[in-house]
Every structure is written in C-alpha cells, then in structure tokens.
Amino acid sequence: KIADKPVVQYQEGVEGIKTLYLQSLESTTEVISILDLDSFEIGEIKDFVSGCARIRKKKQIKERSLVLDTPIARERFKEMFHEEQFAQCRWIDPSKLPGIVGFGGMLSVFEDKAMVTIIPRPGQAGMVIESTILTTLLKGLFDLAWDVGRSIGVPPLHQV
C-alpha cells in the first residue's frame, strides 16, 4: 500500500471551526500546533481556543505549539495562555517561514488528523484531513521546526 486514502471534513464559519476543533479534545496523542496569533482578533475564537487549551490540560493531553513571533502574537499569547503552558510553546521567527506568514490561522496535528483553520473574515473555514502519511510527515517537520524555536520566555526578536 503506497498511501492511505484521506478522509476530509470541511466546515465554514466560526461554528464550523469550533466543531472541528473539538476533535482535539478527544485526542489520545500529543497535539502539536503552529499558530499565527495575529489572526486571532475575533474574541469568540480567541476565547474558545484558550478554553480548549485549559480543557486539554485538565485531560492531561500533551500539547506543543510553535507560535509565529510578532508583537501582536506576544500580546495575544499573554491573553490566551496560562503561564504553566509556556514551557510547551516556542517562538518561530516568521522570516524563516516566509510562506506561512499571514496564513491567518492554525495547523494542528493529533492522532492521524491534520486540522487547518483559517480565521480572518471573510473565508473563515476549517478542515480536518485524516491521513497517517500526511500526519507522519507533518509531525516530522514540526519536530525540525521545534528544534530551532525560541523559548517563550526570551525577549522579542527585535530586542535580541
């Protein structure tokens, strides 16, 4: 077997994004994410995502996040996440990922699912792709990026 046949779920709007995102609360594996927090200006999404992070913590679902390092992201990070979560998050220099700058959402990988959410209006949407091959590849790429990520406690890039 060369590849598994992916299963794709697609939802539009804030409620659709929430419906897809809830799947990560049932994960039996670590949840890894790349976040463009600049796009989290919508209070409803911001509050929902930070609430889900608290629920995953209570359920002891491990989580690691790479966050694009911008001044807006640093402010939103403080608003959305509790201090004990900081150790499992790292900043990524956006200039090292020019193709991802401004993508406007989040990529999360858990179990055999890859979830992409696009948050800015118009065009709010999300999709979950179930594919072992895709998630194995994304997990490997995430680990490479994790190794070059900077600790959440470090000063912003423009102050280094």
Region locations from a protein language model:
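PLD-like (HKD) phosphodiesterase/transphosphatidyltransferase domain
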Residues: 1-65
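PLD/PLD-like phosphodiesterase catalytic module centered on the HKD motif
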Residues: 1, 9, 46-160
